[in-house]
């Protein structure tokens, strides 16, 4: 019997689709999602959502109904989980990072190592930048015992996309629980300030502004400058991440856009990082949204803390509870939110 998910629940966006498809593919359970993105100005499935569905279907030989642009209803019934080498093209500047969110849990439980080359947007609005996924997401997954890497080949910005990244994953038998309520002491802050098809001073000014903002808090940052001229269109951005002596990693990011000074871009990224550091939370809000799935799949009790209980986070926990016999608990304490769950110890 299919799990039935109301796509308009909570934040009512693409996150519901991504989590539902990932868990359906992983567990081999059919899912029917209705009212997909019903509250959005452009409701229904968009190209990047369709790409995630199609790749998940490719990896599982799934039977799919309703996978077309604008569709508000989708039926997904997976068969056999596959592995190997695959290439996909979103066909727009749709976010590669959001595709990775869908695929990562599936790839970790595939029967053999898998490599997927994804073409699309690496640094686009309303999605984590690719550098966040490379240097925060994958490092947090390591704490769960997962081996997943992301290699950046070329950057792609809105509206033309054309970015490319290679995702590689090693199969895991079981994920292990993570207990980390406090960030710990900062060991190092690193970052990348990039500019594509733009003057080098854009990346330099972004990095300088970020460093200056961090220095006000007594923090030093090693921010690399990356200037490229191989993009289909111009774009820039900054991602900064902090590593603690407890092994935690949190990030802050900002995207350049027409009319937005480079200094503002750098300052925003630093301020986001500082805001989380001040709470001493073990993960940032972006990562909390994603981490709860791995907590639920892991063996044993996991506990993390984050600086903000977002609607994305609440929605994701609800969707996970529809597929797995888990119950999340959240508690606000000392300016941060602690999330706890007893994982199912899933294995294939």
Curated annotation (Swiss-Prot):
Keyword Nucleus tagged: no
Pfam family, one: RTC
Catalyzed reactions per annotation: a 3'-end 3'-phospho-ribonucleotide-RNA + ATP = a 3'-end 2',3'-cyclophospho-ribonucleotide-RNA + AMP + diphosphate
Binding site for ATP: 101, 286-289
Keywords linked to the UniProt accession: ATP-binding, Cytoplasm, Ligase, Nucleotide-binding
Protein encoded by which gene: rtcA
Chief localisation class: cytoplasm
Domain of life assignment: Archaea
Subcellular location: Cytoplasm
Protein name listed in UniProt: RNA 3'-terminal phosphate cyclase
Function: Catalyzes the conversion of 3'-phosphate to a 2',3'-cyclic phosphodiester at the end of RNA. The mechanism of action of the enzyme occurs in 3 steps: (A) adenylation of the enzyme by ATP; (B) transfer of adenylate to an RNA-N3'P to produce RNA-N3'PP5'A; (C) and attack of the adjacent 2'-hydroxyl on the 3'-phosphorus in the diester linkage to produce the cyclic end product. The biological role of this enzyme is unknown but it is likely to function in some aspects of cellular RNA processing.
Transmembrane segments: none
GO BP terms, alphabetized: RNA processing
The family this protein is said to belong to: Belongs to the RNA 3'-terminal cyclase family. Type 1 subfamily.
Catalytic residues (positions): 312
GO molecular function, one term: RNA-3'-phosphate cyclase activity
